[in-house]
Amino acid sequence: GLGDVYKRQQVKYLVEQGKLDGEEARREDYAGKVADSCYRYVLDVLERTRPVVKALSERYKLVLVSNFYGNIQTILKDFGLFDFFAGIIESSVVGVRKPDPAIYRLGVEAMGLPAENVLVVGDSFSKDVVPAKTVGCKVAWLKGEGWGNEEIDETLPDVIITDLPELLSYV
């Protein structure tokens, strides 16, 4: 777009003036392209999943349990998801991280329900499925490509889905 043309002109000018090294400019350009690509991916995912989260929030109390850095509320607001959650349990705020089952106990407490009446939806077998089951929750495993060579027992989750919209036919 026009913004990209303007940015390229700025970079070219800075290189010509000796204020920016050509290699540094290429790295910066590449980093910007990677960031833009990641951002577009997030927007694509949100387009598919926001309606699901909205529908679930209209029928159920939703609490987010996440290993994050103290700014997840801002991120959720920026992407129009904040209002769907009745509570947020963020690891850096509560001082406990997944896979410690204690973070799921905090989520269950925030729900105000017995653990067996809580459905945890998670994408990590070792950090979501195992600790949530340890606490006594039901679990929907959003199974994607694995992060490593963790041992997996596919009988442990109550349901296995590969795309979030599938969850609507389960609940």
Language-model features: where?
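Short, small-residue-biased leader/transition segments that mark boundaries at the very start
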Residues: 1-6
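Hydrophobic/aromatic residues within well-ordered alpha-helical segments
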Residues: 7-10, 68
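Conserved alpha/beta-hydrolase catalytic His-Asp/Glu region
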Residues: 11-33
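Solvent-exposed, charged/polar functional surfaces in cytosolic regulatory/catalytic domains
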Residues: 13, 33, 37, 55, ...
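Alpha-helix C-capping/helix-to-loop hinge sites
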Residues: 17, 37, 91-92
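Asp-based, Mg2+/Mn2+-dependent phosphohydrolase catalytic module
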Residues: 25, 50, 54, 63-171
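Short, acidic loop-to-helix structural element flanking the phosphoryl-transfer center
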Residues: 35-63
